[in-house]
Amino acid sequence: MQIDRIEIENFRCFEHFTAKFHKELTVIVGNNGCGKSTLLDAVSIAIGTFLTSFDDVGGYGISKDDALNKCYDMGSVVELQPQFPVAIEASGSLCGQQITWKRELHSAEGRTTIVDAKEMTSISSKLQSRIRNGEKPLLPLISYYGTGRLWAQKREKRNMGLAKFNRQMGYMDCLEAASNEKMMRKWFEKMTIQSASSGKVAPELMAVKSAIAQCFQSITGYQDVEVQFNLDTHELDIVYRDNDLEHRRYPMKSLSDGYKNTLSMVADIAYRMAVLNPWLLENV
């Protein structure tokens, strides 16, 4: 998936704004309050259209609170009026096809339209049908990591058992501002128990652990790094040998904010890749 261009109208601080993105990397620079996060949130809503066709995932729409507010002098008071329609239009490529799609919210009581996004939803609908039939299409990783992920944790709306991890669950909460570490820990728990039962570590679990361990080793310089899921505490533990050659073991949640945030993002990316495409085994 590649977003080449996005055009937004009456979305938060923007009455009208258009942005183009480089195919490799786009860096957005601006003063505080100029709308950098707003632009990224608009992109996440556009990308969220892809998720609307997947079972148990749901899409991401435009909220009435996203509407631009205009100020009008009314005698001795200043009145705020939300502006509609709120519109987000994007163009790019998905599964080898060049597509354009648009989402709109026409009123505070309305719902985000999807009628102008059929090019996008038809692709995701076909992917969902193939998954349902047991086929193995390669699903793209989608994730959004906002500035509040370190402090905000997603509150689970339902009790998801260990057996629930079908492929599309790799898209659950992938565009939320708050992280869902509980779901990630449930995946580690399931795979750890499964590995213990079979007597061998699942290749995809080994690959995810290796990604986290390599990240921790590269930013700290510590050696013999291992990642283990603690079945007693239900936490991810980092085991390593420090500069004094002493063996240490700490829960990932107890690390400094910088380490924790970095490792959490790497872990989230890696485990979602394993959930979305488990048939790739160690190549996830």
Residue ranges and their predicted role:
Residues 93, 170-284:
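Extended helical coiled-coil dimerization/tether regions that scaffold
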Residues 1-183, 200-204, 214-217, 221:
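P-loop NTPase switch/coupling surface
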